[in-house]
């Protein structure tokens, strides 16, 4: 074989290897509407862009049902989701697997691959479970440290008003699950339903006592809770599943960009609860833009130049 033929063959091989990246469609990156959704969506977006992937920014697209509907219909290609939501997606809330980080991940990964051709990538070692927080002055005065204490307080006729999203109020595995486990029931005048699912809004409502609110829906990785003078109520009965955040990508898109899993693995593996709380606080308390917070973190860790 001549040198020219070898050279021509090498160029052809190089073109073939490069072709999928060049020919692939832009990746539609989405996320939920809340603070952490903005953070994780921007992290995914920026990691992909740093590797030359063209993207369409659909970060903070909407609530869980909206974003889930978008990826199953192909309107989105990748977004961050939480393992515990598998219980809700597959109507399987009673399986104890959802309360174990590894078992829950393996289960949702298997079900989504089989039924929806969606691939779950490496999750973060964090639990962004739903919680209820109360104003610290109310907690201290009434000895409230757990949801069991809250149940007792409400039975005694304690003043209570909760700011929460409609999703938290209505979903069987959210507020209704807490009410059932801890034997209390909130009336409509004890609830302030806020649009969307952004806990930065619900937490501020409690901190500022908006419309008489003294408690709020929050997440386990929310940063501003203590900073705003609120206290998280523990869940001693373990009502909530483990909600570990992970990138979820359409199988067809992962085949176009097989390196995606490798790019995102170390990034999500670094996002433990303390790290997420700090990053979320930068957005919700300090008022920094989620795009900037994501960029600064990725640069600091050396994943993006």
Residue ranges and their predicted role:
Residues 1-10:
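Bacterial N-terminal signal peptides that target proteins for export
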Residues 19-23:
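Sec/Tat signal peptide C-region and signal peptidase I cleavage site
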Residues 83-176, 180-184, 188, 194-197, ...:
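Contiguous mixed-secondary-structure segments that line small-molecule binding/active-site clefts
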Residues 47, 65-76, 92, 181, ...:
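Short helices/loops that flank or line small-molecule/ion binding pockets
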Residues 35-54, 176, 180-182:
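Short, polar/charged alpha-helical segment
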Residues 26-44, 59-63, 167-170:
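Extracytoplasmic "Venus flytrap"
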Residues 35, 57-69, 166, 187-204:
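Short helix-initiation/N-cap motifs at beta->coil->alpha
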Residues 9-18:
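Bacterial N-terminal signal peptides
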